[in-house]
């Protein structure tokens, strides 16, 4: 699927917050049902991207955050330390240090995916592949029992 998408890419200038809100709308019911608090930082950035594919990647990342966060919150904000970097941070179960380097590999589910029997091992893989084709970069930071931060360097942000 990611091989075919290159011909489908349409780069334009989009409002980042608008794309984030679209992704959140898809999961609004789950936030309510699971009683997960959403902390969405107001932001005024435009990003050069393909809206459809960035939206797809954000939806995959939010799906994972909701899947592995039983209580607490999901926060979406711009990094203070890393320029042009969007952060999606959850208070979920976290990813073990031995699984962290491999979670974006195709088909890799790690301990959490096997333990929760909900993982295909494709969500983060597809997100990383798609973001790469969009000239964005995905990084992960995680601590077991504390949560996970997904950092997306969007590059070429304008405000």
For each feature predicted by the language model, list its residue ranges.
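Acidic ATP/Mg2+-coordinating residue in the GHKL
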Residues: 90
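Conserved micro-motifs of the catalytic ATP-binding
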Residues: 4-9, 42, 46-49
């Amino acid at each position: 699927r990611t091989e075919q998408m290159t011909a489908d890419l349409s780069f334009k200038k989009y409002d980042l917050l608008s794309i984030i809100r679209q992704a959140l709308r898809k999961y609004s019911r789950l936030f309510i049902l699971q009683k997960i608090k959403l902390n969405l930082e107001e932001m005024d950035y435009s990003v050069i991207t393909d809206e459809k594919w960035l939206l797809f990647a954000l939806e995959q990342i939010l799906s994972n955050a909701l899947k592995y966060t039983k209580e607490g919150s999901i926060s979406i904000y711009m990094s203070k330390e890393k320029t042009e970097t969007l952060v999606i941070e959850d208070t979920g179960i976290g990813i073990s240090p031995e699984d962290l380097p491999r979670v974006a590999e195709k088909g890799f589910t790690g301990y959490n995916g096997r333990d929760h029997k909900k993982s295909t091992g494709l969500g983060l893989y597809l997100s990383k592949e798609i973001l790469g084709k969009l000239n964005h970069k995905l990084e992960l930071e995680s601590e077991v029992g504390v949560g996970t931060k997904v950092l997306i360097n969007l590059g070429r942000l304008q405000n």
